[in-house]
A protein has these predicted regions:
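Conserved hydrophobic/aromatic beta-strand scaffold that supports enzyme active sites
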Residues: 11, 27-29, 146-150, 163, ...
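A structural signal for well-ordered alpha-helical segments within the folded catalytic domains
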Residues: 96, 100, 145, 205-208
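Short, charged/polar surface micro-motifs in flexible loops or helix N-caps
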Residues: 108, 122-124, 153-156, 169
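Short, structured patches in soluble enzyme cores that scaffold and shape functional sites
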Residues: 116, 121, 132, 149-153, ...
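Double-stranded beta-helix
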Residues: 154-208
Length: 208
């Protein structure tokens, strides 16, 4: 659906101004959207997942280990398909305000893909370079979006996620190098035109 057609649909959660702002800047923030009680359940689940990796020494297609991972000090980069691991995760994806927001911005027919945990540890970790998420998807249709939920408070001191407002209106940059190898990042040559000087940090309390 076009943005004009989507905006004609009755909203389930967002105001019309919020919907229009999304199409203008390409993202929205909802501080403290997820309740403290919901977050506590998630934190327990995450702790169990981390503990379960103490005996793992190499990454798999579902669990990506951070460099320096040990049984004594487990460090993960990401865990995929978390919605398959616990019914609470699936409820957040399918029976919460999140699918209502998705419908307000994508149209009434929404398809869920998967839920993933990204870990950002203290004392450094793997660098995440400037990239465009759509380049990671096996889709040619641009009508997709990601929802990110902070399980803990995120401040500027923690090196938070940054986004470039309105960059969705610009070009999709190549994420392969000159040897046609996947890099998962915008090339240094393209960064000068990607608008990174206009980037804004996404910070907020847990549940944002």
């Amino acid at each position: 659906m076009s943005s004009q057609d989507i905006l004609k649909q009755p909203a389930l959660f967002l105001t019309q101004n919020q919907r229009e702002l999304y199409f203008e800047q390409g993202y929205l923030m909802f501080p403290g959207l997820i309740s403290t009680s919901e977050l506590e359940v998630f934190r327990v689940l995450v702790s169990k997942i981390v503990d379960s990796t103490r005996t793992i020494t190499s990454s798999s297609n579902k669990i990506d280990l951070e460099k320096g991972h040990t049984a004594e000090n487990p460090r993960l980069r990401r865990v995929t398909y978390v919605d398959d691991k616990d019914p609470h995760c699936w409820r957040l994806c399918a029976d919460s305000v999140i699918p209502d927001i998705a419908a307000d911005l994508l149209g009434p027919d929404v398809r869920f893909r998967d839920m993933m945990l990204n870990f950002k540890w203290a004392d450094g970790g793997a660098e995440v370079k400037w990239h465009q998420d759509i380049c990671f998807y096996p889709h040619t249709h641009l009508g997709s979006m990601q929802f990110l939920v902070f399980l803990e408070e995120v401040s500027s001191e923690q090196g938070p996620l940054q986004v470039i407002p309105a960059s969705h209106k610009g070009p999709i940059f190549e994420h392969y190098d000159d040897s046609n190898e996947w890099t998962g990042a915008i090339s240094p040559a393209d960064l000068s035109t990607a608008g990174i000087d206009d980037a804004t940090e996404l910070t907020g309390p847990a549940g944002t």
